[in-house]
Amino acid sequence: MQASELRFAPPSADKSALEEGRLFTPRFDANGLITAVVTDAGDGTLLMVAHMNAEALAKTLETGIAHYWSRSRSSLWKKGETSGNLQHVESISTDCDQDAVLLKVRVGGEGATCHTGRRSCFYRNVKVEDGRPILTENG
């Protein structure tokens, strides 16, 4: 995979510029990552939460295909590359202080986002039963 040429300027110390300005200056954390929340562009279903480093974010912006940083593998990850369930990005938004991004995507292939084969990684609800937290299948 070819390295990206897109570079991000450091975040402004001026809060107004960060919150109201036109320059996208993502605030990566101490590990060089930004949180990426991913939803279905059609119906808004929450599909997954992942992380991006500068290269993954740049590749996503340049190609229109979602790329993430795998913390477990310490490597760039083109979502759906092996399964065929590529995430085609329709829009990217950032929050007020630019430390998280929201990707609205259309999933190709069979439409699965989760490695378990499900559409969403959020397929279980957390509840309390008999004083213990338990998981139940949702939907």
From Swiss-Prot:
A GO CC term attached to the entry: cytoplasm
SUPFAM superfamilies in the cross-refs: HisI-like
Compartments reported by the entry: Cytoplasm
GO biological process, one term: L-histidine biosynthetic process
Known pathway: Amino-acid biosynthesis; L-histidine biosynthesis; L-histidine from 5-phospho-alpha-D-ribose 1-diphosphate: step 3/9
Catalytic activity field: 1-(5-phospho-beta-D-ribosyl)-5'-AMP + H2O = 1-(5-phospho-beta-D-ribosyl)-5-[(5-phospho-beta-D-ribosylamino)methylideneamino]imidazole-4-carboxamide
Keyword terms of this UniProt record: Amino-acid biosynthesis, Cytoplasm, Histidine biosynthesis, Hydrolase, Magnesium, Metal-binding, Zinc
Annotated positions binding Zn(2+): 96, 114, 121
EC number: 3.5.4.19
InterPro entries cross-referenced by the UniProt entry: PRA-CH (IPR026660), PRib_AMP_CycHydrolase_dom (IPR002496), PRib_AMP_CycHydrolase_sf (IPR038019)
Superkingdom assignment: Bacteria
Oligomer and partners: Homodimer.
Function: Catalyzes the hydrolysis of the adenine ring of phosphoribosyl-AMP.
NCBIfam families, sorted: PRK00051.1 (NF000768)
Family to which the UniProt record says this protein belongs: Belongs to the PRA-CH family.
Protein name: Phosphoribosyl-AMP cyclohydrolase
Lineage: Bacteria, Pseudomonadati, Pseudomonadota, Alphaproteobacteria, Hyphomicrobiales
Gene label: hisI
